[in-house]
Amino acid sequence: STAAFGLALRAWNQGWPIGVFQFVKSAKWKVGEENALRVLGASGEGGSVDWHKMGEGWSWVQRDAQMDNEEKAREGWEQVKRDLAAETYKLYVLDEFAYPMHWGWVDTDEVVSVLRERPGTQHVVITGRNAPEKLVGLADLVTDMSKVKHPMDAGQKGQRGIEW
């Protein structure tokens, strides 16, 4: 996500309209990248920024919540498809979207087909681990970021300004 939002800042600076679609992360979470890009998007100085949250986060134990998140992920993908067809944005950030594909909530073959056939010169960035090989094969650029060391490994809680 960090690299994707850095790219979004560059796109904003070029005046590109940006659509951010957050999958998996809760709509209740207040994250710094959202606040910053919303302020920049509303400033009138660069491109516009629209922020869409798909679901309320995930749970490892609540099946009802998982089913709701599966539905929200599918609804979110449907919205992305509509926006791609309408060429709504020049840059799409599908944050954590690799997970719904990995978990089987969204059909990878359909995603690959839609991205391959999208009109215009729209750029799509998908974040998240375990990206399906078909998606990796289609991509122009793939980054695999891996943690070497993190304060949480030593028991430190997430830090304001660092993790959010």
PLM segments and residue spans:
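Conserved P-loop
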Residues: 2-85
